[in-house]
Curated annotation (Swiss-Prot):
Co-factor requirement: FAD
The organism of origin for this protein: Apium graveolens (Celery)
Keywords, ordered alphabetically: Allergen, FAD, Flavoprotein, Glycoprotein, Oxidoreductase
Annotated coiled-coil segments of the chain: none
Keyword hit for Disulfide bond: no
TM region positions: none
GO MF, any single term: oxidoreductase activity
Protein name: Allergen Api g 5
Keyword Glycoprotein part of the UniProt annotation: yes
Length: 86
């Protein structure tokens, strides 16, 4: 299964090109069979809560490749197991 720390690296690179606020990993839902995962991240600007961001990523070995941003988990319906809390 993907290492949750890999998502931090992935989100960090994504946020630099999309958002200026810091991105904090909240949860990971991974599908090891399809080698895909959905990340849920909270963006903060100082102490102010900014937004919830979802991104679908593809795992390639120990690295991640961003596929697309999704508005919510409802936009990517599937049976994701297991559920990781970070």
């Amino acid at each position: 299964l993907p290492n949750p720390s890999g998502f931090v690296t992935c989100l960090s690179s994504i946020s630099k090109s999309v958002y200026t606020p810091a991105i904090n990993l909240k949860a990971v839902i991974a599908d090891p069979v399809a080698k895909t995962a959905v990340v849920q991240a909270g963006a903060t600007l100082g102490e102010v809560y900014y937004x919830i961001i979802y991104a679908r990523v593809l795992w390639v070995g120990n690295t991640t490749q961003k596929l697309e941003w999704i508005r919510s988990l409802h936009d990517y319906q599937s049976s994701f197991f297991p559920f990781f809390s970070a």
